[in-house]
């Protein structure tokens, strides 16, 4: 769903969403399983002196990619919340990415919180932000440090066109001049 309309399938995603200015937000200081709140995003944007523009592609660096291929990868990194995701999408962001296993916090942290309070809204809350405002997210990104700057680069991330699919592969590239 997207504002009450059926969600776009991967073959319906407008290509202009997938080639745009990039911005890299650094949250490597946050603990594994910690929430990246809208206030955190605002603070980071202030630190790097950047104002989000429509169709910016926002990349979130948690440091989780350093654990790729290791069992602990699945529990590494902070994760976005519904609130922080909506903060970005309300500004016109349509594509985001993260270097962790999921756009949300790692699953064991979600499961533990659900076990403690029984509130199903903690499960995939950032994913479900797309029900209110549609967006696409890339997960398991790597080498975000190689970009070398927080803005002033272009991201190209065209998805493989699979008819009717809710997701697809992408090979994202940051073009740094």
Annotated model-derived regions:
Residues 1-177:
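Active-/binding-site microenvironments in catalytic and ligand-binding cores
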């Amino acid at each position: 769903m997207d504002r009450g309309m059926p969600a776009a399938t991967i073959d319906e995603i407008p290509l202009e969403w997938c080639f745009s200015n990039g911005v890299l937000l650094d949250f490597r200081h946050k603990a594994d399983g910690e929430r990246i709140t809208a206030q955190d995003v605002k603070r980071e944007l202030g630190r790097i002196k950047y104002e989000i523009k429509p169709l910016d592609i926002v990349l979130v660096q948690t440091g989780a990619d350093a654990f790729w291929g290791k069992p602990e990868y699945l529990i590494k990194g902070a994760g976005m919340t519904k609130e922080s995701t909506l903060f970005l999408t309300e500004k016109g962001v349509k594509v985001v990415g993260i270097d962790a296993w999921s756009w949300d916090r790692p699953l064991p942290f979600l499961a533990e919180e659900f076990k403690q309070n029984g509130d199903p809204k903690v499960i995939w809350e950032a994913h479900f932000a797309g029900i209110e405002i549609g967006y696409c997210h890339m997960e398991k990104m790597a080498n975000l440090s190689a970009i070398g700057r927080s803005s002033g680069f272009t991201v190209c991330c065209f998805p493989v066109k699979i008819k009717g699919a809710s997701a697809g592969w992408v090979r994202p590239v940051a073009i740094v001049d």
